[in-house]
Amino acid sequence: MAEYLKQANPPVQAIDTATAATVQQMLADIQQGGEEAVRRYARDLDGYSGDIVLGTDAFLQAERALSDGVKQDIQYARDRVCGFAQLQRESLLEFQSELRPGLIAGQKLIPVSTAGCYVPGGRYAHAASAIMSVGTAKVAGVDNVVATSPARPEVGVNPAILYAMKLAGADRVLALGGVQAVAALAYGLFSGHAADVIVGPGNRFVAEAKRVLFGRVGIDVIAGPTESAVIADETADPDVVAADLVGQAEHGPDSPVWLITTSRALGEAVIARVPALIEALPDVARAAATAAWRDYAEVVVCDSREEAVQVSDEYASEHLQVMAEDLDWWLAHLRNYGSLFLGEETTVAYGDKCSGPNHILPTKGAARYSGGLSVGKFIKTVTWQRLDRSASREVGQIAARISRLEGMEGHARTGDVRLHKYYPDEAFELGTLGGHGAQIA
């Protein structure tokens, strides 16, 4: 039976009505007031009154602000992420098949026309996130990719984010953050192209705006705080495990980190090491990690690796690391996670920044039914079919009978009219409303 060496504080199941009300009001204001309302919110909330649509001068200035080494690192990340996305794209196939003589059906892949990519820029400069969203959309074949990131007063968009956006292929870049940015993407403001899909992580206001707009636009996930779990057995190095937990706790004061271990000694050793690692962080990261570890961290000791799998699947963590023997066994048995990192040589930070697979992942248990951002989010998988008259003769009779069984006479008659047109001298058994067997000439 699982034993907790450390448990998170009991969750507060509060409904954030204030955030919801604020977002609803802002979306209504922007839908009515358009671009001027967006400018007003950018000015009032972010203190930014500069250009919203960024052009060549801004991109060149951002490029000049970065060292060659930084640009090379961003290019490396772009190559890995877009390369992985290209492999995903190649795994998606169109096909057609003759299901019976004269009945041909197929599957077609159609990219959405416009994607909106939100790139956060608050506590940290998320250059990698720009690549994850914009680059993946372009590999998927999206014609219009509109990217947006918060601008700071007198500074604008972080140059690393701006450079990454342009490098990844953004067709238009907006200096906007928060609800006003999401609204601009959804309503097509400053671009003339209303987004079909909006992706990218953000704060609770961004997440709520995406939730409200879902249906009008497609979204990736309603992102919550970043989560990370580590599964470790007695062979794991407690120093490495502790470093990885702290590294993810710095995301924010409400970012859960969980250790699932089959070794009590390892769990106790990790708990002992974490405080010193947190204390050594820079101020902003230290404050976030301190709160996250204190309030949201858990350390669970399991009797077996099978129980560890069960506990992990219940967490359904956004990120899941495994530092244990027989990595292939874990790969085969684990089911619920956003992205899996196998072995000590592999850490979440690699995936967060540059190794290839996307870092925009499901949170709050959504990994039970959803995966991370991929090219598939930007591609509609649609079907088509074509029948000749011989196939229509067979299918039409059965469709008419099923339609009448269901009480849908209008549906049935669309088959009737074709059968009588193509085969006027034949009689067919086309069913009766609510039953079978009647013959209609």
Residue ranges and their predicted role:
Residues 95-163:
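Conserved small-residue-rich beta-alpha loop and adjacent elements
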Residues 251, 259-337:
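A glycine- and small/hydrophobic-rich beta-loop-beta segment
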Residues 305, 313-440:
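C-terminal core of ALDH-fold dehydrogenases
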Residues 169-256:
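Conserved NAD(P)+-binding/catalytic subdomain of aldehyde/semialdehyde dehydrogenases
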